[in-house]
Amino acid sequence: MAVFLWRNLFQTTKARMLQQRRASLYNGAHDYDEELIKKKLQQFAGGSINLSKEHSGIGILTLNNSRLMNAFTGTMMLELQERVTELENWKDGKGLIICGAGNTFCSGSDLNAVKAISNSQDGMNMCMFMQNTLTRLMRLPLISIALIQGKALGGGAELTTACDFRLMTPGSEIRFVHKHMGLVPGWGGAARLVRIIGSRAALQLLSRAHGVDPERALHLGLSEGTLSSSDETGSLEEARAWLSQYTEGPASVIQAVKKVVTAGRELPLEAALRTEKDVFGTVWGGPANLEALTRRQK
């Protein structure tokens, strides 16, 4: 009976939290038509978003459009949403590394797509679409790293802020270039940047639009460290090793840890406490907890 009740509680809580993570920030009341913007984005093809899920519970999400420094085309934006949905359903997942192909991270949006949707409504729809996707990415119950090689520019810089941690390689750079394009971040990058490094430092980075090298990023708290390797294979192996210190243990427990931290960051205190209680209930008396209690008795 106890096992049945635990499983029922776990499934109910899991379903409710999954629904909350997928909830759109915007709807028709905001003049947001997701199907319309999907049709528009579908017109701008090129590149891909590749996902490999390893037996260790680590996912590798690769931006692949090396001809344009891994800039997001319209179809890549759509594929990113699909990959996030896939990761939301990955019950064995523990961690995620986001990287770019060809020793560079991401140069933002494909300018051909930007020019074609330069009217206000299309731009707003694209903004809302990417905010939805990157918010869901940030809320994944996986511990995530942006592995920054080469350049992370504009929207690429914004993408790094949707990850829990950032690791940089020698000679890499994060740069919020939006001001030089007559813009501000539109994919949620400004709001997330303020939460990562504070409002004063965020204002400096956005208003000066200067590049941030690994040393300064570490000083600002924008990066957790600089890897020793700058090549694609070596840096990925280093990132895996770095992430492993946080992902040791059962996937259910790692995901629970991420969920309570996300709740504490985003929700008012009372709501965060209720979420913590619900998540606690999914692991209390669960397999990992019972195994740990058995080990302690020996």
From Swiss-Prot:
Catalytic activity: (2S)-ethylmalonyl-CoA + H(+) = butanoyl-CoA + CO2; (S)-methylmalonyl-CoA + H(+) = propanoyl-CoA + CO2; (2R)-ethylmalonyl-CoA + H(+) = butanoyl-CoA + CO2
Keyword tags: Cytoplasm, Lyase
One Pfam family this sequence matches: ECH_1
Record GO cellular component, one term: cytosol
EC class of the enzyme, as a word: lyase
Location of the protein in the cell: Cytoplasm, Cytosol
InterPro entries: ClpP/crotonase-like_dom_sf (IPR029045), Enoyl-CoA_hyd/isom_CS (IPR018376), Enoyl-CoA_hydra/iso (IPR001753)
PROSITE patterns: ENOYL_COA_HYDRATASE (PS00166)
GO molecular function term, any single one: methyl/ethyl malonyl-CoA decarboxylase activity
Cystine residue pairs: none
UniProt signal peptide: none
Function statement: Decarboxylates ethylmalonyl-CoA, a potentially toxic metabolite, to form butyryl-CoA, suggesting it might be involved in metabolite proofreading. Acts preferentially on (S)-ethylmalonyl-CoA but also has some activity on the (R)-isomer. Also has methylmalonyl-CoA decarboxylase activity at lower level.
Name of the protein in question: Ethylmalonyl-CoA decarboxylase
Gene expressing this chain: ECHDC1
